[in-house]
C-alpha cells in the first residue's frame, strides 16, 4: 500500500503539479490543494510529505507548505515538514495562508500566520468533525480572519480495489468514511456557512464585509495590542529542508 501511495504521490514540479497550476490558470482562480507530496531527489525522496499548495490565477505557485509534524499513525507514512511554508500569500482580496489538520493545535504555528496579517485562512482536515470545527472557529476568532474549513468526502466505493474490506463495508458502497463538514467562519468566530456533511457539491460563498477583519481587532489583536514582545521572543526558522 505504501509503495502505491508513493507511486501516486504528487511532485510539485512534475506532471501533477503542472496540472494543478494549469487548472488555476484556466479558470482564473486562486487554488489551494492538499496533496501527498513526493520528491525525486534529496531529503525525503523515499517518503511522503503532507503538503498544501497555493496557486495564483496566473498559475504561479504562491506558497508550498509541508505539515510540520505527522500526527500519530501518520508517522508511518509521512516525513516531517519545515517552517518554509509558514507564510501568507498576498492576493487582491487580502493575504491567504493555511495549516493542515492538527497543526491547528500548535500555538506557535498559528502565531506564525497571525503575525503576517492573515485575512483568509484555509484549514484542511480529513473531515471537519466537532473538535475540528472548534479548532477552526477558535482560529478565526484568535486571528480575526475568515476561515475556510475544508473536509474530504470519501465513500467505500472510492477505495482502491486492492484494499481488503470487511463484509459490512462491502455491502455498503455508498457509506461515507469521511463525510466532509466543510464550513466558512467569520472573524468573530461565527459561522457564515454551517458545516456541510454527506454531500459532494461545489459551494459558492460571497464575502463582502472585508472590514470585519479590522473591526474585530479592536478588542483582540494577537500580533499587536494583545501581544507582549517584551515578554515573548517569537521567531520562525523558515529554511526549506533540502
What residues fall within each predicted segment?
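Short acidic/polar active-site loop segments enriched in Thr and Asp
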Residues: 119-120, 146
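Active-site gating loops and adjacent loop-to-helix segments of metal-dependent hydrolytic enzymes
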Residues: 1-5
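Helix C-cap/helix->beta junction micro-motif
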Residues: 26-27, 143
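Active-site catalytic loop in hydrolytic enzyme cores
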Residues: 9-22, 38-119, 125-138, 168, ...
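Short beta-strand scaffold segments in enzyme catalytic cores
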Residues: 34-35, 50-54, 87, 182-184, ...
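C-terminal beta-strand edge segments of enzyme domains
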Residues: 152-242
Amino acid at each position: 500500500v505504501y509503495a502505491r501511495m508513493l507511486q501516486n504521490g504528487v511532485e510539485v514540479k512534475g506532471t501533477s503539479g503542472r496540472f494543478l497550476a494549469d487548472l488555476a490558470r484556466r479558470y482564473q482562480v486562486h487554488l489551494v490543494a492538499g496533496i501527498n507530496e513526493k520528491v525525486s531527489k534529496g531529503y525525503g525522496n523515499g517518503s511522503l510529505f503532507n503538503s498544501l499548495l497555493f496557486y495564483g490565477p496566473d498559475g504561479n505557485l504562491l506558497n508550498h507548505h509541508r505539515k510540520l509534524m505527522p500526527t500519530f499513525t501518520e508517522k508511518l507514512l509521512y516525513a516531517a515538514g519545515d517552517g518554509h511554508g509558514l507564510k501568507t500569500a498576498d492576493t487582491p482580496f487580502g493575504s491567504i495562508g493555511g495549516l493542515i489538520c492538527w497543526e491547528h493545535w500548535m500555538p506557535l504555528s498559528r502565531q506564525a500566520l497571525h503575525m503576517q496579517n492573515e485575512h483568509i485562512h484555509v484549514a484542511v482536515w480529513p473531515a471537519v468533525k466537532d473538535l475540528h470545527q472548534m479548532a477552526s472557529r477558535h482560529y478565526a476568532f484568535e486571528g480575526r480572519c475568515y476561515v475556510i474549513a475544508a473536509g474530504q468526502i470519501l465513500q467505500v466505493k472510492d477505495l482502491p480495489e486492492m484494499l481488503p474490506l470487511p463484509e459490512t463495508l462491502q455491502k455498503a458502497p455508498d457509506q461515507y468514511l469521511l463525510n466532509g463538514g466543510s464550513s466558512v467562519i467569520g472573524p468573530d468566530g461565527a459561522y457564515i456557512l454551517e458545516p456541510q456533511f454527506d454531500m459532494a457539491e461545489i459551494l459558492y460563498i460571497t464575502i463582502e464585509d472585508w472590514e470585519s477583519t479590522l473591526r474585530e481587532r479592536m478588542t483582540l489583536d494577537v500580533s499587536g495590542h494583545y501581544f507582549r514582545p517584551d515578554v515573548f521572543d517569537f521567531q520562525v526558522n523558515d529554511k526549506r529542508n533540502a
